[in-house]
């Protein structure tokens, strides 16, 4: 969690201090506990609200000097929109909107978690806390000069006033684990590539041992013995050898079939011999966003002690050009035994995933596999930065991912698969080639991956537009978004986790 912002829960009866934040709907109404907290100043506040351009729209804010009678220095009114229609993600965004109004000078903040109809449920209060922490995260580890008046330099203790503080604290415990998982994923994506290379990434993933996650790290020797020729071909041009990390959380019944998540972890992608243009190449430090998500997800599931068996697997490489680098025209043999003609060395992520998907399918026999990868620019052309591309061989899995995408705000959009696309990756020299035609590039990339899932129920999420550099929003002000952690945590919790 962000060290500079701390959240806790207190009863409504605790006196507000510092900055007071209250909620108001689009009818400009306050709840009873809010009116009581405002005391004799309530009429003054209502007049100020009515006289302003503030309409109570969701996430809107009105910042006021505290009127006489209030023992706080500042009053912030946050709009909820139609309070009765608020969904879980709406409440999370309210928390983010609150964090957005916390200034560098605010050291104590009290938020009255109440809607006009009455107190928020404990789960809603927990969502407010999560939204505050997700919005407050910043990555400034490498800045040697930090400005005290930086709007992002938050250093506040936030007290969330609720009807039942103990119940809210209990509801927040699993949510807090998910927040930590999202922030871990963001940290990994934001790290520079000279710091986070495959061996270092593997070490950081191994820190999940502290939470009870079993860790297995496959080095070059182990991957060579497994005949992971597709992954090793990508990494052979780098001074940093590749790694595959297998994480296992045993939270379900002994022997119960696990669910599995696989992440692409290209720690830096130059394109290899098919080198990329220099413009924005620095962003290719984020080409491991899928692997970052899987590590963050495993943290979340283990920290909240999810009642399910889970495999998390990440393939970690750098794609670099040197005298040992893979060439266009090379033919490699994957772990599956299928041969691949390399047409473009910049279509490397699918090669990494091919071997890791096959390994997981054969070794662990999961109920399903979901892979995440910043795989193609084509998906950004198709969907922009608001949706990840979803490809699947299983309608039920696709429908479930779509449903939790809506509920979490981490949206997906299903794209087609079919034989007419699959034939585009047939090769005259090998079993397949690693790129198809220019058209439908995200689809042919998914068709390639499907050849390595061995009939396992599978979904592929192309997160090129959502994992890094996406537009900032109410709950994320970071370049690395941590996309996918909340989505997949919800998938597990909603459909695959043993109920209490």
From Swiss-Prot:
One of its GO terms (biological process) is proteolysis. It is an enzyme of class 3 (hydrolase). Binds 2 manganese ions per subunit. GO terms for cellular component: cytoplasm. It is found in: Cytoplasm. The keyword Metal-binding applies. Mn(2+) 2 binds at residues 264, 269, 287, 348. CDD domains: Peptidase_M17. The keyword Nuclease does not apply. NCBIfam families: PRK00913.1-2, PRK00913.1-4, PRK00913.2-2, PRK00913.2-4, PRK00913.3-5. PANTHER family: CYTOSOL AMINOPEPTIDASE, LEUCINE AMINOPEPTIDASE-RELATED. This is Probable cytosol aminopeptidase. It comes from Rhodopseudomonas palustris (strain HaA2).
């Amino acid at each position: 969690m962000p060290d500079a912002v701390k959240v806790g829960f207190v009863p409504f009866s605790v006196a507000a201090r510092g900055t007071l934040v209250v909620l108001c709907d689009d009818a400009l109404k306050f709840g009873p506990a809010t009116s009581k907290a405002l005391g004799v100043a309530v009429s003054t506040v209502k007049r100020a609200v009515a006289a302003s351009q503030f309409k109570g729209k969701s996430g809107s804010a009105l910042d006021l000097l505290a009127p006489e009678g209030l023992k706080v220095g500042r009053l912030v009114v946050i709009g909820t929109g139609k309070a009765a229609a608020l969904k879980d993600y709406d409440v999370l965004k309210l928390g983010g909107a609150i964090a957005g109004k916390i200034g560098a000078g605010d050291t104590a903040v009290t938020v009255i978690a109440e809607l006009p109809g009455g107190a928020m449920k404990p789960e809603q209060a927990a969502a407010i806390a999560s939204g505050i922490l997700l919005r407050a995260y910043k990555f400034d580890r490498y800045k040697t000069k930090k400005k005290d008046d930086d709007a992002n330099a938050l250093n506040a203790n936030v007290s969330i006033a609720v009807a039942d503080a103990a119940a809210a604290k209990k509801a927040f415990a699993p949510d807090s684990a998910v927040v930590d998982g999202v922030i871990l994923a963001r940290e990994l994506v934001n790290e520079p590539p000279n710091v986070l290379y495959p061996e270092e990434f593997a070490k950081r993933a191994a820190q999940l041992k502290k939470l009870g996650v079993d860790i297995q790290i496959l080095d070059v020797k182990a991957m060579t013995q497994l005949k992971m020729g597709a992954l090793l071909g990508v990494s052979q041009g780098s001074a940093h050898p590749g790694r595959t990390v297998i994480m296992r959380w045993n939270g379900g019944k002994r022997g119960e079939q696990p669910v599995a998540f696989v992440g692409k972890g290209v720690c830096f992608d130059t394109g290899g011999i098919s080198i990329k243009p220099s413009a924005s190449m620095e962003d290719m430090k984020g080409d491991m966003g899928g692997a970052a998500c899987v590590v963050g997800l495993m943290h979340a599931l283990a920290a909240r002690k999810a009642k399910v068996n889970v495999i998390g697997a990440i393939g970690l490489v750098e794609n670099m050009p040197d005298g040992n680098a893979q060439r266009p025209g090379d033919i490699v043999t994957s772990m599956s035994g299928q041969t691949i003609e390399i047409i473009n060395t910049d279509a490397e992520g699918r090669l990494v995933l091919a071997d890791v998907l096959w390994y997981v399918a054969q070794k662990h026999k999961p109920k399903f596999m979901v892979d995440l990868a910043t795989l193609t620019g084509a998906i950004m052309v198709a969907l922009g930065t608001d949706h990840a591309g979803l490809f699947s061989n299983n309608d039920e899995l696709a429908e479930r991912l779509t449903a939790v995408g809506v509920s979490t705000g981490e949206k997906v959009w299903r794209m087609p698969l079919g034989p007419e696309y699959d034939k585009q990756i047939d090769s005259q020299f090998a079993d397949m080639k690693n790129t198809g035609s220019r058209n439908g590039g995200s689809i042919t990339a998914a068709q390639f991956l499907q050849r390595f899932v061995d009939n396992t129920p599978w979904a592929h999420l192309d997160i090129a537009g959502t994992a890094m550099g996406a537009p900032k929003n109410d709950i994320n002000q970071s370049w690395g978004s941590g996309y996918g952690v909340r989505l997949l945590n919800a998938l597990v919790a909603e459909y695959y986790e043993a109920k209490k």
